[in-house]
From Swiss-Prot:
The keyword Cell division does not apply. Pfam families: IGPS. It catalyses: 1-(2-carboxyphenylamino)-1-deoxy-D-ribulose 5-phosphate + H(+) = (1S,2R)-1-C-(indol-3-yl)glycerol 3-phosphate + CO2 + H2O. The lineage of its organism: Bacteria, Bacillati, Bacillota, Bacilli, Bacillales. It comes from Listeria monocytogenes serotype 4b (strain CLIP80459). Belongs to the TrpC family. It is an enzyme of class 4 (lyase). This is Indole-3-glycerol phosphate synthase. Pathway: Amino-acid biosynthesis; L-tryptophan biosynthesis; L-tryptophan from chorismate: step 4/5. Its EC number is 4.1.1.48. GO terms for biological process: L-tryptophan biosynthetic process. GO terms for molecular function: indole-3-glycerol-phosphate synthase activity; phosphoribosylanthranilate isomerase activity. InterPro entries: Aldolase_TIM, Indole-3-glycerol_P_synth, Indole-3-glycerol_P_synth_dom, Indole-3-GlycerolPSynthase_CS, RibuloseP-bd_barrel. Keywords: Amino-acid biosynthesis, Aromatic amino acid biosynthesis, Decarboxylase, Lyase, Tryptophan biosynthesis.
Amino acid sequence: MTFLEEILAQKAVEVADMPLEKVAEKRKTYSFYEFLKANTSTMQLIAEVKRASPSKGEINMGVNPVLQAKSYQAAGAGMISVLTDPVFFKGSIEDLREVAKNVEIPVLCKDFIISEKQLIRARNAGATVVLLIISALTEEMLIALFEQALALDLEVLVEVHDQKELAVAQKIGAKLIGVNNRNLHTFEVDIAVSERLASDFSSDACFISESGFRTAEDVARVSQKYNAVLVGEALMREATPEAAAKSLKVTR
């Protein structure tokens, strides 16, 4: 069983037990897509709150998610990503709820979303952006969840890892497309994945390169074709996350 297969099997169990919440009022913040379109001179940062991962194990179990997120916001991050998967990443929807209450910028619910129940729960907790991972979904499920998310007035970050998935993301009209440098089956990371796929960008979407960034030099590798990078582990291991986040700022 690959990492992704194991995660999805567990996620199906989780979602079966998850209540269907009533849709509550949406948290007010700016559109991340509009923010990226308006701020093109610098590579923007999605900074992540992540306690652990399947490949690295514990990264920072003692983190205070609110303080971490506030450090990211102070450093100029355009959005905070919060892992809400409890089993493999040791996150929780409560982490997201607390972060969303304490920052002004958009918050991304980072999880393996397979059900509308998760979309509503994320919105009610304060997320205004949700992640849909193409490799975790059939195309039929992807389109259904994409449309449900838009109906809930959520922005959708559609994640791809290869040319075929990129073509699907562009075909369905995704405005935020994330290229994950991590192979979710093996969890191996290679920034060259983003470099390769950039030649196939054809839509008016904003493009985000995800995973593997530790230095400004790493970020510079993708700065010509991408609007933002998503960084988690490198920031979570730093004693001074605000300074670490600032050090990743690159002019485009």
